[in-house]
Amino acid sequence: MATTSHNKPSLFPLLSLLCFISIFLLLSLSKRASLSSPKTHRSATVFPPKPDGSLSPLSATCDFSEGSWIYDPNPRSTRYTSSCKEIFKGWNCIRNNKTNGFEISNWRWKPKHCDLPSFDPLKFLQSHRNTNIGFVGDSLNRNMFVSLFCMLKSVTGELKKWRPAGADRGFTFSQYNLTIAYHRTNLLARYGRWSANAKGGELESLGFKEGYRVDVDIPDSSWAKASSFHDILILNTGHWWWAPSKFDPVKSPMLFFEGGRPILPPIPPATGLDRVLNNMVNFVEKTKRPGGIIFFRTQSPRHFEGGDWDQGGTCQRLQPLLPGKVEEFFSVGNNGTNVEVRLVNQHLYNSLKSRSAFHVLDITRMSEYRADAHPAAAGGKNHDDCMHWCLPGLTDTWNDLFVATLHTIKAL
């Protein structure tokens, strides 16, 4: 009996190994989840299988926001050229002789589990007849608007300038009666200069002499009618909320009002952003057209190195960042020059919880890699432009994402 018991293999080492493997896998999954950006309201799209039941590259759930940039040394013909007249001079990196101006568009975004196709501008025009599309936000939304315009303009010459109420730019593609417009608004909410009243007041009693009045419950006049006019709306805000050159916290602070009265005690910009987002989201939900499709675009990243724009910061890279470098640039824990992008997104995601009327266009992750795609010194300013994007360039991919998501929404 003793001999038999000694010959039996012990199960303890095997059980120990299985426990170790299980713990390792759990820790690995936990770490992966902690490094990824929020999944809520992502640009995740469900595509049906092919008629024969086989899986296509777009089958199953596709999270377009996670992937990598693949260099194509022999890309297909460009979708539009640097001669598109709507391109703002400072963004025309090819004409401005930026070193990698031609190569910027050679990089293709490849999501992890599917493909993001380049949209067909002619098919888009044909399938969106009698449609109004509005971009509402700061100059980064104009960047995206110009990209879409140039791609559509490349396949049709029938065009007329026409601006809806409040719009800064607008065009109608006559043959298709499709209008696209850009409504400029930095904060979404109405704001303007504020100066102390000689007769005194609530803010004056606290020592405020001047600043900027921000009415958190009133949309800026540039887009107040946009949600009831456009069939498709793409909104953004973020960059101007932490702009000390404009809203100096001491010399010209943001002073928030609601219901026509100052919010007391005064609140910081981060809290003001939350108030504005909640109010503007409510406004759009109440005023949008029946069947209207509303997107909120996530924050576009900046890529300043060596300081901010007014501190000698530059962006001279000629290739996309590697994943590890992306975290150095943008991790909230590092609190670096460019951390604004993820901070703004936290506010955005919080404001859109349980908001079924909104679709989030998550361009942040794919854009965080593209430190090479800004105008930089070729922007013609007295400092590197590491905030806007070259055209042709990255915002063309934003529009691919926009169109792919739009088609899926309409197919549901």
Curated annotation (Swiss-Prot):
Keyword terms: Membrane, Signal-anchor, Transmembrane, Transmembrane helix
InterPro entries, alphabetized: TBL (IPR029962), TBL_C (IPR026057), TBL_N (IPR025846)
Locations listed in the record: Membrane
One Gene Ontology term of the molecular function aspect: O-acetyltransferase activity
Topology in membrane: Single-pass type II membrane protein
Keyword Phosphoprotein assigned: no
Motif GDS motif boundaries: 137-139
Main location: membrane
Keyword Magnesium: no
Superkingdom assignment: Eukaryota
Note: Contains 2 motifs that are conserved in esterases, but it is unlikely that this protein belongs to the catalytically active pectin esterases.
Record-stated family: Belongs to the PC-esterase family. TBL subfamily.
PANTHER family xref list: PROTEIN TRICHOME BIREFRINGENCE-LIKE 13, PROTEIN TRICHOME BIREFRINGENCE-LIKE 9-RELATED
Function text: May act as a bridging protein that binds pectin and other cell wall polysaccharides. Probably involved in maintaining esterification of pectins. May be involved in the specific O-acetylation of cell wall polymers.
Name of the featured protein: Protein trichome birefringence-like 13
